[in-house]
Curated annotation (Swiss-Prot):
Cellular compartment(s): Secreted
GO cellular component, one term: extracellular region
Major location (coarse): secreted
Organism phylogeny: Eukaryota, Fungi, Dikarya, Ascomycota, Pezizomycotina
Annotated signal sequence range: 1-19
Glycosylation sites: 69, 183
Protein name: Uncharacterized secreted protein ARB_00107
Entry-linked InterPro entries: DUF4360
Key words, A-Z: Glycoprotein, Secreted, Signal
Claim: Secreted is one of the keywords in the record: yes
Region of interest: Disordered: 171-195
Length: 209
């Protein structure tokens, strides 16, 4: 199964990242990194709801996004809208102008109830507004499966943020279900326990401009 980037609804004019050749990431990180949400939207986080939370890890090496309603399910009666939901978040990133970051990998946390023959997948597209490049992560699990999960994937390539103190960073994440058994059922939803969200941890690499 392949993740179709088109189904995340990104027009070519919204394309992604700053196309700069890969370099060895720096071991140091900036002492400041803040996020301000510009907007969010999608079937899994309508723009008029407060269903997305985000923060920067204390070491500035990851961004954590928590989704309250990023869920998908499949059975004999579900529609395509039930079987896939997405959430696009546009963040204003502010930091030091002599550093750039790139998405290195993503880890997804949630809860799955999957019969045999059912597959659930997470995928994300990352890009910086005004740049013509993008990166993505995509990973999944197959049934039979019950309980909380952790799924990891490395970014398919490095795209680096602009050298500047503030810039828009876009993350479009979806969850989807597929099945090769018409009688099977499946659901990917919020993690069981106190956290109670679908969580995405975006690991960052840094380098100096």
């Amino acid at each position: 199964m392949k993740l179709s980037l088109a189904l995340l609804g990104l027009a070519a004019s919204q394309a992604v990242g700053l196309a700069i050749p890969d370099a060895t990431p720096e071991t140091d990180v900036p002492d400041v990194l803040t996020l301000t949400e510009r907007h969010h939207g999608g079937s899994g986080c309508p723009s008029n709801t407060q269903t997305v939370r985000y923060n920067v890890a204390n070491d500035r090496r990851s961004i954590v996004i928590q989704y309250e309603n990023l869920t998908a399910r499949i059975n004999s009666k579900t529609t395509p809208a039930d079987e896939r939901t997405n959430c696009q978040v546009n963040l204003q990133v502010a930091g030091r102008n002599n550093y750039q970051f790139s998405v290195a990998s993503a880890t997804y946390y949630g809860s799955a109830r999957l019969d045999a023959g059912v597959t659930g997948r997470h995928g994300s597209i990352y890009y910086f507004s005004g740049s013509p490049d993008q990166a993505f992560t995509a990973t999944g699990i197959s049934g039979p499966r019950r309980g909380n999960y952790r799924l990891d994937d490395d970014a398919n390539k490095r795209i680096w943020s602009p050298c500047g103190e503030s810039y828009p960073f876009n993350i479009n994440t979806d969850v989807r279900m597929d099945s090769d058994n018409d009688n099977a059922t499946g659901e990917m939803s919020r993690e069981d326990g106190a956290d109670g969200t679908v969580k995405q941890v975006i690991s960052l690499d840094w380098r100096r401009c």
